[in-house]
Amino acid sequence: MKTMKKLWILMAALTATLLLCVISASACTMVYVGSDLTADGSSFMARSEDYSNGYNKIAHVNQHGKYAAGSVYEGCYGFIHTFTHDSYAYTATSDDNTSGVCPDCGQTHPHTPMEEVGSNEKGVSVSAMVTLSPNGTVVNADPMEDLGICESDMATILLSEASSAKEGVELLLNIFDTVGAGEPSGVLIGDQNEIWYVENFTGHTYTAIKLS
């Protein structure tokens, strides 16, 4: 009996120690499950955001036409995009800026902060992004662009504009080619027919792989 009591005390102490430990993470995790691994042949993509608890999340619905054709969107860090058509409706999760100040960039101009995951009315889903770390040699050869597209803006633009996963991939690659990337990224873009993984480590160099 005394042995069991000591064991429970030890377990309680270990649990308390683990709960008191603060583990700081600054990254995200994406999951892809191919059709060959599921019972019904479906493919899955998912994500978790592993970051500090100071960034509350809001799940919301963006109505069709929130961004009108020809309107200009300015993102967190200066990336600018002109919409080619009235934006598609989509659901997404973003950081909470209901106070009027973006918790990510500290700016007050209208934009959606870190809208990193969502699905639109055409069945396109985006997970943007996972954090990557390039070496200095490749970045020196092909530097990031100060006003390039960043994690904070990818899902907003792709879900508003793309009617298929492939169209979303083509749009993102065109942005990399013409405007450039503001940071390295790994992005999943999918629909009911296929899922793509797009990765860049420099401003204009990338790879796009069709996973399913």
What residue ranges belong to the model's regions?
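Bacterial N-terminal signal peptides that target proteins for export
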Residues: 2-12
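Bacterial N-terminal signal peptides
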Residues: 11-22
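Membrane-interface motif at the C-terminal end of an N-terminal transmembrane signal
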Residues: 23-27
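A contiguous strand-loop segment
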Residues: 28-150, 171-212
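Short, charged, surface-exposed loops that flank catalytic or proteolytic processing sites
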Residues: 161-167
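A structural signal for well-ordered alpha-helical segments within the folded catalytic domains
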Residues: 152-153, 166
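Short, well-ordered beta-strand elements within core beta-sheets of diverse protein domains
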Residues: 155-161
